[in-house]
Amino acid sequence: MQFPEGFVEKYEEILGDEARDFLASFEEEAVSAFRVNPLKEAPVSFPDAIPQTPWGHYGKVSGKSPEHATGLVYSQEPAAQMVAQVAQPSPGMKVLDLAAAPGGKSTQLAAYLAGEGILVSNEISSKRAKILVENMERFGATNVVVTNESADRLAKVFKGYFDLIVLDAPCSGEGMFRKQPDAMDYWSLDYPSQCASLQREILADAVTMLAEGGRLVYSTCTWAPEENEEIVNWLLEEYDFDLLPVEHINGMVAGIDLPETARMYPHQFKGEGQFVAHLQFKGENPSPKFKASKSNLSREQVALWQEFAKKHLKINLPGILQTFGDQLYLLPELLPDLGKLKIARNGLHLGTFKKKRFEPSFALGLALKPSQVKQSVEIDQEAFVKYVAGETIQLAESLPNGWYQVLVQGNGLGFAKVTGNVLKNYFPKGLRFK
């Protein structure tokens, strides 16, 4: 591999005798892995589990497979999986993933929350925020709001609000050189220092959003000390934080002069490059006096939703019902009014109000477990291939007309309308594949 000018010399100085093994590891193939989604009701048994992780496995799952389409698995390399594992929120917590796209860490945080509490997944890039929405919906997370904002604008709404903030910061990307060689095109000796300036700027806003006793998990996919240990030392000097120890598992090593932090090198850890630090906020931020979100449905809309829910659902969905145009969303409770922010997904998309009727969304059919739905229809592998390509499906027998959750391998793939023995196609056009 042809490294950028100055890279080899830098890491020979940092790593000493280990530099040779470190540099040789770039000639090896990048490590692929995925996580199994514990929010799904019909798990599949997978081999080659990643040691000391709850849901991780080495290997690849096709993006065109039923496992991927239903959100049962999420592809994410092993080092990246360690960040949310360090954060490990408890159900009921208020959590912010500040730089969330494409969604690996947010889906993992949502798995820990298990539908309780609030997860705000933020992405400043509009294009990447759309990908984030797709991945969160496929995962079936019900308590997630996706915002498309800068950290400073979020800070105006969420002062002192979050129990946990995860920042996988924009960085020089050295840890991705093996997986994405194009990342080397941007690298220069002074690039890490440029990135560090942006990281400090984002973190300054992040700190103001922490509740007293709240935790901050800071990570990068680079090895540059300027963006890692130097940033952590800056946080400890500028703000009232305690540095919490990160458990070094699976070949992680201590950070440079900061043994509580963790580094992942590809010659020691079976994965790509990552740094992670875990801090607890001891300072005080003004307690937020925010206006809570409220339902804005008309009586007719409430009646239409209740009619659908009574006929099709076995559970009551907790949260705040809000319409945006003719679209119905379920917002997490205790969420501030987000009217001043750019929103990419305002909670769980439940469906659409049409003339005197309500049509369920694809996202709702992904989020609900089969045990929570009164009517479902299972399709086999052959029918799945046709369905995701946009075709209608001929069922083996006629069913009563109406809406059914489509199941593949026991997991939801949206809702669809059945007429007799015909399953109409409601798989979103933008997601279809052959």
What are these regions (language model features)?
Residues 124-159:
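S-adenosyl-L-methionine
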Residues 92-101:
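Conserved class I S-adenosyl-L-methionine
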Residues 1-40, 272-275, 282-434:
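Polybasic, low-complexity RNA-engagement segments
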Residues 127, 163-202, 221-228:
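Mobile active-site "lid"/loop adjacent to the S-adenosyl-L-methionine
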Residues 162, 215-218, 222-329:
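Class I S-adenosyl-L-methionine
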Residues 114, 210-212:
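Helix-to-beta-strand junctions that scaffold the AdoMet/dcAdoMet cofactor pocket
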Residues 90-91, 155-166:
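A short acidic, Gly/Pro-enriched loop at the edge of an enzyme's catalytic core
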Residues 102-115:
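Conserved SAM-binding loop of SAM-dependent methyltransferases across substrates and taxa
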